[in-house]
Every structure is written in structure tokens, then in C-alpha cells.
Amino acid sequence: MAVHHKRAGAHRGRGSKPGRGRGRKFETSRLKDVSEDNSSGDEERANVEPVEEPGDSEGSVVSSGSDLDDQPRENSYSTLLKLLNNDAKSNEPARKKRKIRPNEQHTSLSELPIPVEGDVDPGNELVDMEESEDEIIDDADSHLEDDIDGLVTDGRNDPFESHFGNPDESELSQKIEACSRRWRSIKSDLIDGLYAVACSPDVEQATSVVLPTTPTPVDLKLKRKLARSAISFDPLSTCLTPYIFGYRDTFFCSRTTQNSAKLRDIYCLHALNHVLKTRDRVIKNSAILSKEDGGDIELRDQGFTRPKVLIILPTRQACVRLVDSLTKLFPMEQQENKKRFMDSFSAADNDGWVNKTDDFKELFGGNDDDMFRLGLKFTRKSLKLFSQFYSSDIIIASPLGLRTAIEKEGGKKLENDFLSSIEMVIVDHADALIMQNWEHVEYIFSNLNLQPKEAHGCDFSRVRQWYLDGHAKFLRQTLVFSAFNTPELNALYNSQMQNAFGKAKIMPKYDGAILNLRLPISIKQTFSRFDSLSPLKDPEARFQYFTRTVLANLSRSWTETSSGKGKLGGTLIFIPSYLDFVRVRNHFANSSQTANISFGLISEYTSVQDSSKARSHFMNGRHSVLLYTERAHHFRRYNIRGVSNIIMYGLPDNPIFWGEVVEYLGTAPGGTTTTPTLRVLFSKWDALKLERIVGTARVRSMLLEKGGDTFTFV
């Protein structure tokens, strides 16, 4: 479980153990640790750069990443000059190319020659040298059926045609211009407590952005080969598929362990449908150009490079599940490098996790390495794993793995042209990516759909016009699936999801995590609101409120005993942010306000040995206070005993953590005479977190109430 904090340490590194950090161990005499000689040697050893596993070298881990260093370079401007010069030298007058619409019947399909799959895409100069004979399309009848299937369609009914194949240029121009000015939105209720906020660029005579449900998979415009193995629909599928298969940007904020497999099947089916339609169109048009000798026909059906779908996942095991879903929906006769893939990406679950929660097992089960990237190439009869990026149709990667493919050491750009023609981005388990390092995700999005620096063998005469105009980001579809919403995800939705055809945010209505506590006794839950002028000033306002109000009252009533556990001993302080954790830790170590308090520390950077020691001392009373971060809980899910009081310095992002942490109060020793207490600090900038804890019906009054700033639940 590699941990990467975006403000602490470098962005590189990987491993299978959690809680690694590059900072020195925090030491203070107030920790009252008698075994001071046992320093954080384990923590330092965890910081050593990992050794590559056998068979998992750059060529295999990176798969398609190794091709980024060795590609032939050609200046795209020089390529254009060559084309112009060749035309100028010709004695014959230039013929005007005739543009062929997708639904125009130019020639009989039965007259088309049988093209070669591996060579039909002029934009792919980096095809694999070991092309197999299976990539030759040797079945004319099969090819004819595929041409009819999905290519000769009514563009008004197929979202692929209206979005990518043949969009109305005038309407598209208006929508792109409106994207930077104003959006209009409509809110509608869905099923099971879900509701959608659908948005579209505000243009004249715009159609409604509320989409009807899709009753069955038959209503989807699928390739025939996919329709045969299409998934079954449940109520959630009928609500989501209109936005996903309609090429709208979609932000789904209710991902769970129960629906994650269904969501994965839905977006895999959509990605496959998009890739197959794109490749079949290129094959058909290449055949037309071959038949007509390419003289007077203009067919724009490509981007600058071949990769069309980017899927961002948190772990290698998640990648295994995704590839399994792809091959289930689109069975292939051959799967090249499958054994190599399973050996380097898959692993067995930990047998000692019987008591771990389902969300923990789903995320960290199997191979939880967060450093990987993989290219997938589809041919008629085979799927090739570990294909080079420039000859791949789908790229699957972790944020860290993809960033290291783009950057060199020192932040120097290495290569991002393979991201120039991405038409679909899928971010699954986004809440887990936030706990890794969200800055990597932001960096990847900043490198999408840029004009390429090199030609890469691109045939510019076949590049779609909106690519040449630099408008690809307005047609790219972005799908984000998360267990909950956060400010980081909201920022991504507002800044990077700029689909000219619209977008939708689908969210649940919360009952509140406070209603689902499993405690043997009832406890008083006190929420204290403090004033904060802006998100930037919120950390300072929170710290001042904590030290002057909460900690001051705590210190005055503290009664130390010889064992170090007094009246308010066994106090757990839960701190979501690591930077806030460092500030509170330093205050406990250096302030006279806490001079008589012994405390322990557990953060995501604390070694396993030191964490065990801190938990033991806290349970035995040698530490009166334990500082505990949200990311430490995310990666380790400790069961901390001896907790009599909880102070939440801030609300957790994950509502599951609320119940797990508050239920520590049920593990206090049976002889404890003090009544367990819970106090929570929040400001108006915590609205998203607060809604998940207290419920949608209560959050508004708690944020706007002017009669007081303290709210109590029993």
C-alpha cells in the first residue's frame, strides 16, 4: 500500500507496505517512551527505493512506457512542408478533395478490398514489429458483416456519429464557445435516493439536458459483437447509461463495493464500443481511399495518435479486474502476454484480513502496488497486452505510473504526445486516488489533448478538424466514479470536464452516518462550528479554535496520575490533514499548554513498529493522548483500544471512517467510570463532509443556524 502525500516527499516511489515517509522520526521527551533506543529503523528502510521485481522491469511494468524513449522523431511542421512541396512540384493542377459523409453511400461494400488491420492507421508509426498473421483480415464475409454493423448507421440516432463521427460543425462551434461562458443546469431525481444535476452549454435552442432512462441493453447502439455479450441492466444501469453511452461527462458519487463490478462492466462496454467503432471506421475509410486511389476524397476519421481511451486506477489488482471485464464482454481467440500480465499484476488476498471491512479488501486485496501502466491493442482476433503506447487503443495506468512515463527526473518533460488524441478518460475509485496523491491526477489532466510535438507518422489529411483547431478537450468524454464527493473532485468537474455535449453529476441523498453507529451505550455527539473567512484561511482558524477553546478546556480539567492516565485520559484526536497533524504535534511537543500531557503519534508515515508501540502505550495509559490521521486509518484500519474520549479536529472525507473511529469508544475498559464523549470541529467549508455525517436534511441548518454554533446529537 504505497502512500504518496502530495506535500511530503517526492512523487516517485512504490511498494507494498503502507506508511512510508522520507522525513526524520519525530522525537520528544513527552512521548514517555522507555525504549527510546528502538528508533525508526524500519521507517528508514521503508524509504529505500524499491528494487525491480524479476520479470517486472521497465519493459514489463511500463509495458508501453519503454517505447517512449526510443521513438523516431520527426518534426510535424517539416512533414507538412514536405507534403506542400510535393504538391507544388506536380505539373498537374491540384484536385479539390470531396468530403464523404459517414452516411453517404459512396461505393458498394462488397466492392471494397480486404484491408490489413495492422497497417490501416496512418497515424500509427510505432506499430509492433512482430505483427502476427492473425492480424490479417482474411475472412471477407466477416469483414463485410462488420462494415455493415455500426458503420452504415443513421448518425442522428447513434451518439458516436453525432459526437465524433459527424457532428454538426455550426452547432459544435456554438457549444464550444458557450463552454467558457455559461452553463445551464437541471436537477432531477433518479432512483434509490440518487439525484442528478445535468449541465449543458447555454446556447440558443438547446435541447433538454435531462436524459430518459435506457430500459435494456438492446436500446444501446452497440457493435453486434458486443451486443451478443451485453450485460444485464439493473435500475442503476438504466439511469447511468444514457449519460455514459450518450457521451456526456459523468461524475458518479455513489460508488460502493456492491455496485463497483456493475459500474466497471458498464464503462468497459462503452470503452470497447468506442474503440471498435473508431477502428472499424478507419479500416473502412482506408479501403475507400485504396479503391479511389485517394485522389479526390476527404475522409477525416482520426486523431494525431492511436490511443483513444485512458483508464486511471489505484492498484494493479484493480487493473486485473478491469482486463477480466474487458475479455468477458469481448471474448478474443488470443490474448497475447496474458500469463506475463497475471504474473506481474495479480496476487492472492491476505488471509489475515478476515476482520477487515469490505471496502478495505476491495482496494488493498491482491496486488496493491500503485506504480503501473499498461497498453492494450485490439485486433480482429486477438488482444495484445503490454503493447507500446503509440500502437495501443486503451491505456490503463495508475496516476504515479503514468506521470513517470511523462516526466524525467527533475520534472523535465519526456513525452505526452500519446495523450494528444484521448477521446475518453475513465477515473475509477477516485476516492482512493485522493488518498494516494491527487496532484498526479491533476498533472495527467493538464497533459491531455495537447497539440503533439512530433508527427509520429500522422496523416494530417485524415485528422478530424476539431483536433487541428485544438478543441479536442471539448469533445473528450470524462467519467469519474467515486464513493463520495470532495473539493478536489468538484474542482476536476468544474475545470476539466468541459464536454460541449453536456455533463452530469449524480449524487446520493444521505441519511447520515450518525444514525448507523454500533455502540453498546449511547454517547453525546457534540458538533462545534467555528468561523472561517475562506478555504485558504480555514487551517489557521481551525488551529486557533482548537488551541484556545477545545485544548484549553481539556488542559484545565486534566488530572494526571502516576500512570499518566487521568480524568480525561484515553483521548483520541483524529486529524484528517497531515499538515494539520504536524502543526498539532508540534504544539503538543513545545507548548506549555500541554507540558503535563504525554501523547503518542500515528500518521501515514509512522512505521508499523512505532505504530504498534504507540497503540500499546495508549491502551495501557502511558500515553494520555493519541494523535491519529485519516490517511493512517485509510491504509491500516487499526482497531485502537482504550479510547474514552474522541476529538475530531476535522471531519473525515470517508463516512465509513466516522463509524469505525467513533466505535472505538465501545472498546474502553469495563471499569472506566467516565462517560464517553465525542466532539467535532467543523466550518462552512466542510459542507460536503458534514452532509455525509449528519444527513442531507440536517446539514443546511447546521451551516446557516445563527442561534448558536454548538449542535448535540444523542
Curated annotation (Swiss-Prot):
Its main location: nucleus. Coiled coil: none annotated. GO terms for molecular function: rRNA binding; U3 snoRNA binding. GO terms for cellular component: nucleolus; small-subunit processome. Residues 1-120 are annotated as: Disordered. Belongs to the UTP25 family. DEAD-box RNA helicase-like protein required for pre-18S rRNA processing, specifically at sites A0, A1, and A2. This is U3 small nucleolar RNA-associated protein 25. It comes from Arthroderma otae (strain ATCC MYA-4605 / CBS 113480) (Microsporum canis). The gene is UTP25.
